[in-house]
């Protein structure tokens, strides 16, 4: 079934229980309750989900939103082993990881992860890679909600010096921080570490973990699911792919054939998409009214659709389906869970369902550039980052509902 296009108000379905309680008093909203221990409400009662579903971190929320249930936790050791065994883990945060004083030693408080989407095509050198998608995933200390905040790729940032490969630092677009960190042997790990430092300096947020998501690898995950429901809000011609004799291929490869090429056009409407189509659509920014902001929203839609499909298909409770999904995910991700084992992430975030994922936007979803043609984040966006850092997102959204990205 296609993703519904109805937008829900933030005082109802798109904020957590604490925020909904606050919204019930029209005159003076009550602030969210103090953070409760993981997996329990502020009243001390175990949290019960509307749709308890198993397996929450094979795509690491946002790129990983498959949720665990208390029922299926029994005997789940083998499932967790598959998840951890299929996904490469390495240090992606460097000095941008949370210190013990910031709560980095465990997951009892709020959880912040940096998700980086890269386009690593086989013909490209490993060092010639930029992070075109930059997302902060925030889970409040109540562990009953997840927020995705996309940072525009063209945001002007101060990239710090990186001693590991001799990069001296400088002013650049956010997407270029990954490229500079990957040079001179830095590789993807170096790219992620320099990006994490850059985003920490920009937002003030330290991270519990990070993931590099190869969008080409995502194709295998979607194909393992069969297809995912996506909605095209605005017709757009692909800037990356063409058809030659009915076969879809990269534009560069299509040109080499010497044959007539037909453009791939993503028509308006909702439908099930195969991996190549969903990924190609989520990559587009040229030809869209709001450029990179529309692309951010489409990529957030992709992530949420993958999570919902995985849960709806029962992939999380079927060992054979899960094995195939984990193997495909292992080709799409590099992961860093900091000082905490991946299994702990899975169990800590088992109370978050796909419908609890809130998609947020910076700068009101419109480009705001400077004389250099780079994006500059406005004061409201900076306040949103401050709300993430102080774990006040539910209250912030009640006060600023315009930051919620419209559902498709």
Language model regions located:
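Non-catalytic, solvent-exposed segments at the cell envelope interface
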Residues: 2-64, 68-408
């Amino acid at each position: 079934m296609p993703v519904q296009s109805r937008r829900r108000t933030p005082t109802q379905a798109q904020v957590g229980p604490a925020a909904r309680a606050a919204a019930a008093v029209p005159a003076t909203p009550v602030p969210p309750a103090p953070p409760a221990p993981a997996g329990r409400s502020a009243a001390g009662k175990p949290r019960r989900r509307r749709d308890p579903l198993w397996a929450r971190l094979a795509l690491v929320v946002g790129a990983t939103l498959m949720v665990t249930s208390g029922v299926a936790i029994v005997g789940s050791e083998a499932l967790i082993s598959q998840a951890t065994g299929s996904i490469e883990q390495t240090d992606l945060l460097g000095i941008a990881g949370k210190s013990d004083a910031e709560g980095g030693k465990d997951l009892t408080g709020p959880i912040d992860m940096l998700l980086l989407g890269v386009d690593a095509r086989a013909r490209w050198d490993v060092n010639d890679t930029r992070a075109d998608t930059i997302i902060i995933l925030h889970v409040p200390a109540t562990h009953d909600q997840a927020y995705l905040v996309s940072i525009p790729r063209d945001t002007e940032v101060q990239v710090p010096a990186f001693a590991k490969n001799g990069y001296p630092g400088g002013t650049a677009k956010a997407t270029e921080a990954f490229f500079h960190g990957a040079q001179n042997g830095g590789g993807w790990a170096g790219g992620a570490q320099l990006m994490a430092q850059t985003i920490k300096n920009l937002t003030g947020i330290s991270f519990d973990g990070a993931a590099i998501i190869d969008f080409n690898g995502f194709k295998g995950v979607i194909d393992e699911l069969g297809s995912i429901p996506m909605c095209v809000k605005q017709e757009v011609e692909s800037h990356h792919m063409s058809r030659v004799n009915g076969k879809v291929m990269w534009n560069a490869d299509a040109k080499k054939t010497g044959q007539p090429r037909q453009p791939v056009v993503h028509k308006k409407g909702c439908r099930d998409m195969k991996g190549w189509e969903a990924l190609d659509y989520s990559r587009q920014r040229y030809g869209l009214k709001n450029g990179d902001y529309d692309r951010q929203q489409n990529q957030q839609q992709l992530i949420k659709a993958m999570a919902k499909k995985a849960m709806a298909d029962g992939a999380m409770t079927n060992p054979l389906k899960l094995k195939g999904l984990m193997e495909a995910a292992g080709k799409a991700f590099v992961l860093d869970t900091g000082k905490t084992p991946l299994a702990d992430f899975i169990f800590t975030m088992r109370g978050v369902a796909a419908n609890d994922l809130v998609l947020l936007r910076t700068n009101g979803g419109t480009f705001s550039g400077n004389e250099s043609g780079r994006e500059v984040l406005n004061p409201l966006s900076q306040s949103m980052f401050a709300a993430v850092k102080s774990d006040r997102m539910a209250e912030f959204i009640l006060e600023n509902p315009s930051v919620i990205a419209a559902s498709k």
